[in-house]
Swiss-Prot record:
Its cofactor is a metal cation; thiamine diphosphate. Disulfide bonds: none annotated. Thiamine diphosphate binds at residue 61. Belongs to the TPP enzyme family. One of its GO terms (biological process) is aromatic amino acid family catabolic process to alcohol via Ehrlich pathway. This is Alpha-keto-acid decarboxylase. It comes from Mycobacterium ulcerans (strain Agy99). GO terms for cellular component: cytosol. The lineage of its organism: Bacteria, Bacillati, Actinomycetota, Actinomycetes, Mycobacteriales. The gene is kdc. Decarboxylates branched-chain and aromatic alpha-keto acids to aldehydes.
């Protein structure tokens, strides 16, 4: 059975589909992204009728997955609905990115009825061989938990998968057949169990003793990264940083995790590509705490970090180490609290962080001066205000912003590990839906935007007013810098970007083209004044101009090692 038999919206029977929605709502999900298909239509009726959860339809399944990712980064849980086969495979890239970047997304796939599957018929959206678990098996590689829901065990399996997603901060997969979705059941009898926890008192005691011995009377330095955010250990990290004068930095992946306006904030650490004062402070620290740090190629200067394990306390998700001695099971929050207590109890006040003399900033460009990368990112950072959510697509946008300090209260989102270009445009939709009270700022290259631009009209339909800066550098600039400076494969078709929003259904917007500094300044000033409108700024830049940090990274690469476009 693949088509509607009755009007589920008027059916008073409580179903497995309702149970799933109630569990998602319990974890803070109030919007679900997706694309309708005949295998999920009845379930969508239940979403529309739900008292808390709202349906947000997307232009395609890939964009829906990206939007769910952006939503999940801010809300701590999200969901996307697709249809069997053609729909779910379209979302696979997005789900894999969420897995790589530790984002909790529940992927709900509407499937054919169990009877139809059991008959092994050649149904549409299948491979025609009677095997309906091809795609379920694919999902095992890119999700932390999966379930092909059956009537008798559906509720228990829903709870299991959702709890795994919540615990591991990675996607889960639910195959919800049409007949299982409508199967009668009872509402949840109790809330989901709290996070299991996993700290051994003995491991904590031994870790604390070893950490105290290593720290002694040394000043501590901290390098933090995104897992602190994903594991909701920011308060514990902030308590550690306030227990003494603690110089600290983040990787690009964890940018905005900490207050970048703090006097103790060193900057962004990127291995050999770091600013020299930051590199020395991290690599020569008497004792270094690495909290939630994952060194990937694109955030570590291609693994050029020089961290001495003998002087390092490494705090991970479920285990920590002191000078390579491992202590487990030990949760991140507990380990951070232990280090904060060590600093508080020792009664020593460390000296202030040595701040290098401030270099004079660049002079304000002439209004008629043609735009370049430096002007663009400097002026954009001036335009940011507390509360903004900034998404920078992988390429010149991400690396152009990485070195700039953000105002307190700004959230920065990138995708430096998975690095799927175009991700940030739908992810910006998800972020804006998650927090409509915070203005979203999207920074994306022209080539990347061409992949996912269909979602622009959804912003307008949802009443959202982002600022979108399209970096028009006439093609794939990062690839030009790596290889093929004049090769035709790094060219793209030129679009009239100021005409695009209207063509895609945006009804309340301002679109401007900036070729010089004065036009950029005017556009960003107008964006600040037009808080209730989408503002699209096409920033025209030289095709071979790249930010200094990206230039530093690209200079040390062979072509297969680098990624990102525009």
């Amino acid at each position: 059975m693949t088509l509607l038999e009755n009007d589920a919206a008027t059916d008073p029977v409580y179903t497995v589909g309702d149970y799933l929605l109630d569990r998602l709502a319990e974890l803070g999900v109030s919007e679900i992204f997706g694309v309708p298909g005949d295998y999920n239509l009845e379930f969508l009726d239940h979403i529309v009728a739900h008292p808390i959860i709202r349906w947000v339809g997307s232009a395609n399944e890939l964009n829906a997955g990206y939007a769910a990712d952006g939503y999940g980064r801010l809300r701590g849980m999200s969901a996307v609905v697709t249809t069997f086969g053609v729909g779910e495979l379209s979302a696979t890239n997005a789900i894999a990115g969420s897995y790589a970047e530790h984002v909790p997304v529940v992927h709900i796939v509407g499937g054919p009825s169990k009877d139809a599957q059991g008959a092994r018929r050649a149904l549409h959206h299948s491979l025609g061989d009677g095997d309906f678990e091809h795609f379920f098996r694919i999902s095992r590689e890119i999700t932390c938990a999966q379930a092909n829901l059956m009537p008798a065990t559906a509720c228990r399996e829903i709870d299991r998968v959702i709890c795994e997603v919540r615990e591991q901060k990675r996607p889960g997969y639910l195959l919800l057949s049409t007949d299982v979705a409508r199967f009668p059941t009872e509402p949840p009898g109790a809330p989901l169990p709290p996070l299991a926890g996993g700290t051994s008192p003995r491991a904590l005691s031994l870790f604390t003793r070893a950490a105290a011995d290593l720290i002694g009377d040394h000043q501590l330095t901290v390098l933090a990264d995104l897992l602190v955010h994903r594991l909701q250990a920011i308060k514990e990290l902030e308590a550690l940083l306030s227990a003494d004068v603690v110089p600290h930095a983040t990787l690009m992946w964890g940018k905005s995790l900490l207050d970048e306006s703090s006097a103790n904030f060193l900057g962004i650490y990127a291995g050999a590509a770091s600013a020299e004062p930051v590199r020395k402070a991290i690599e020569q620290a008497p004792v270094l705490v690495t909290a939630g740090v994952v060194f990937t190629d694109m955030v570590s200067g291609f693994f050029s970090q020089r961290i001495d394990p003998a002087r390092t306390i490494d705090i991970g998700q479920y285990q920590s180490s002191v000078a390579d001695q491992v202590f487990a099971p030990l949760e991140m929050g507990a380990a951070l609290q232990a280090v904060a207590t060590i600093l508080t109890k020792r009664g020593i006040s460390s000296p202030p962080v040595a701040v290098p003399p401030a270099e004079p900033g660049p002079p304000t460009p002439r209004r008629d001066e043609p735009l370049n990368q430096e002007m663009l990112w400097n002026r954009l950072c001036e335009a940011l205000t507390p509360g903004n959510v900034v998404l920078a697509d992988q390429g010149t946008s991400f690396y152009g912003m990485a070195d700039h300090r953000l105002p307190q209260g700004v959230t920065f989102i990138g995708q430096p590990l998975w690095g799927s270009i175009g991700y940030t445009l739908p992810a910006a939709l998800g972020a804006a839906v998650a927090h409509p009270d915070r203005r979203t700022v999207l920074l994306i290259g022209d080539g990347a935007a061409q992949l996912t631009v269909q979602e622009l009209g959804i912003f307008s339909r949802e009443g959202l007013s982002p600022v979108i800066v399209v970096v028009n550098n006439d093609g794939y600039t990062v690839e030009r810098a790596i290889h093929g400076e004049t090769a035709t494969y790094n060219d793209i078709v030129s679009w009239r970007w100021t005409d695009v929003p209207g063509a895609l259904g945006v009804t309340n917007h301002l679109a401007m083209r900036a070729e010089n500094y004065g036009e950029l300044d005017d556009a960003l000033t107008a964006a600040a004044e037009q808080q209730d409108r989408m503002v699209v700024v096409e920033a025209v830049l030289p095709r071979l101009d790249v930010p200094p940090l990206l230039d530093e990274l690209v200079g040390s690469l062979s072509p297969p090692e680098c990624g990102g476009r525009s």
